[in-house]
Amino acid sequence: MAKVKIEAKIFGCSQSMELAKNIADHYGATLGNVLFSRYSDGEFQPSFEESIRGARIFIIGSTQPSSENLMEMLLMLDAAKRASARHITAVIPYFGWARQDRKDKPRVPIGAKLIAKLLESAGATRIITMDLHADQIQGFFEKPVDHLFASSMFLPYLKNLNLDNLTIASPDMGGAKRAYAYAKYLESDVVICYKQRQKANVISHMELIGEVKGKNVVLVDDMVDTAGTLTKAADLMMERGALSVRAVCTHPLLSGSAYERIEESQLLELITTDSIPSRKESKKVKVLSCANLFAEVMHNVHHNKSIAKKFIM
C-alpha cells in the first residue's frame, strides 16, 4: 500500500490574520479559509470552510489582547480536533499570561500553567512560540514545544549597525541571561538595571550596575508593555553619559501611554517584531517581521527536519 502523504494547511486567528498571511506567503502556501461567526451577545464561533481531515494544520494566533484571542484559539483547536486533523500545531508568536509563571504571593493562580493545560485539552498536539517570558513555561506542557528566539533576527540587525563602543543592557535582573547571550555574540560589555517597584508597572527607584559613559547602549528584553521601565532606563543612561540608547524587545504590547512615553524619551529607536499587531505607527519604532522565522520552522516541523539553528539565544 502506498504511503499516504500528509498535507500541511495554515490558518489564522482573526486578530493575527495579517501575520498569518505573511507566514503562509513565506511558507509558499495559501492561507486556509476560516469563517468567524459572531452572535449579537458577543459570543463567536470559528468554522473551517475546507476539509482538514488527516492533515497537519497550523493555527496562528497571538493571545493579546488576552482573553478573546485565547478563546478564539481554543475554539479553533477544538474544531480542528473534531474535524479529524491528524496533527494540530498552535503557533502562538506571543504567549500571553506568561508573567503568571509561578505563585509569587498567597492566593494567586499560576496562569501560564492553566493556559498550557487548556491548549492541550482543546486539541493542540504541538506548540510553536517565541521568546517566552519565562523559559520554564515549556515544562508546563506535556506536548512538544518549539521555543524560538527573536535573537536570530535581532542579532544580524544589530551587527549591521556597526556601532562602536557597544554595550548590551538588561532593564532588570531577570533579563541578565539574555543580555549576556547577546553580549557574547556581539563581543560587547554588559550593564544591568536594578529597579524597585511600588506595584505592577510603577517603578520607585532604578540604578545601573556597570558603566555606560561613552557607550552606544542596546537594551534587550522579551516584551515592552507600558514602556515605563524602558524609557526610564534610557533617560537614566543618557544622564550617565551614554552616546545613544536603543532597545530590542520581541513583543510590542505597548499598552496605555507607551507610544507617548517612547516619543518623549531619549530612546533613539525601539526594534521589535510583528508578533502582536501594532496599535499605531511611530518613527521611533522599527518592526522586523517574524513571518519568515515561523515559516521556516513550520516547514521543518512538517518535514521532520531539525530546527536547532533557530535556537540562537
Q: Which ranges hold each PLM region?
A:
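PRPP-associated nucleotide enzymes
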Residues: 1-313
